[in-house]
Amino acid sequence: MKTLHKLGLLCLLALLALPLGAAEKIRVLILDGRNNHDWVRTTESTKATLEATGRFTVTVATAPAAFAKAKPAKPKPGDAVAKKAFDAAMKEWNAEDAAFTQAHAAEWEQWVPKFADHQVIVNNYNGPEWGNAMKDAFTEFVMNGGGLVNVHAANNAFTGWDNFNEMICCGWRNATFGKRIAVDDKTGKAVALVDADEKITTKGFGSGHGAKHVFTLKTRDAAHPIMQGIPAEWLHATDELYGRMRGSADHMHVLSSSYSKPEFGGTDMHEPMVWFAPFNKGRVVTTSMGHIMAADTSYDALHCVGFQTILARSTEWAATGKVTLPVPEGFPTLDKTSVIEPSKVNWKK
């Protein structure tokens, strides 16, 4: 009996020694599988960041595979023979792509992850529109209080889906979509502009970005749980800076923004970088940070400690409405970037 008593006491002490909430990790679902960016490495890095905090358990749901055969390369202008061969090759490619799509139509329509098993979705998807069952389940999840965090090119998708456009407020859209959204530097609020307000018009009025570069993020709501303890200004590692995003500012709450410098092909305006919006009972956070392409060798945008902090805290807040995660050691300053592999970031208070 004494042995059993001691064993029970040791078990109790072990439980008391666990960090608060260690047995109740937030259940995260990452959606990926289609993207013009490197969705595989984005998911790997995102998953690593979230798991390194000790606050989350992460599952990945990958969309059915796309047609894998590469498109024929375009010939140089003026080569009539090469152009004729290219046209024939494209015709063949399009036929094969259509046949593949038709053969996998049922698989695509039936792709509906079990959203109810999770508390928050991290969206790393930018591809063809989902089937109706998937769209309905996704919408119902967020409407009923599930969290949603959209990363980088995720805001490029679903131009014609009204519910998604309401969730993200603004995204990468063409010049005829909604209003051009910027940030008023004096108030820190999102504002809708007309074409006449645009300072640089040489690149048109649709969404775009200039050259990748290091740029400063400016905190616009220091009191919000996601932003508490984050410097008023800090330097983000090399990334794309989206400009001229379009949509509606009606229910958009900006958390941070960046000035888009003309010398890097920017807009000469302050652009939203992190923002949130309610969607019925759900909380939706969107960030345009986090660029990586298949040909890129640098993880700077994803491994920036500032980005990792925003990602993890946004995910926690979207899921629970609260933030317990601290600002980790090595957070960037106004003068210096900070790029650290997710497994080496120190999240301890």
Where are these regions (language model features)?
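Bacterial N-terminal signal peptides
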Residues: 8-19
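Structural detector of well-ordered beta-strand residues that form the stable sheet scaffold
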Residues: 147-149, 255, 285
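Catalytic beta-strand/loop cores that center a nucleophilic Ser/Cys/Thr
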Residues: 51, 57, 105-106, 116-117, ...
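Helical hinge/lid and interdomain linker segments adjacent to catalytic or ligand-binding clefts
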Residues: 27-31, 38-158
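Active-site rim elements
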Residues: 33-36, 126, 152, 202-205, ...
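Positively charged n-region of N-terminal signal peptides that target proteins for export
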Residues: 1-6
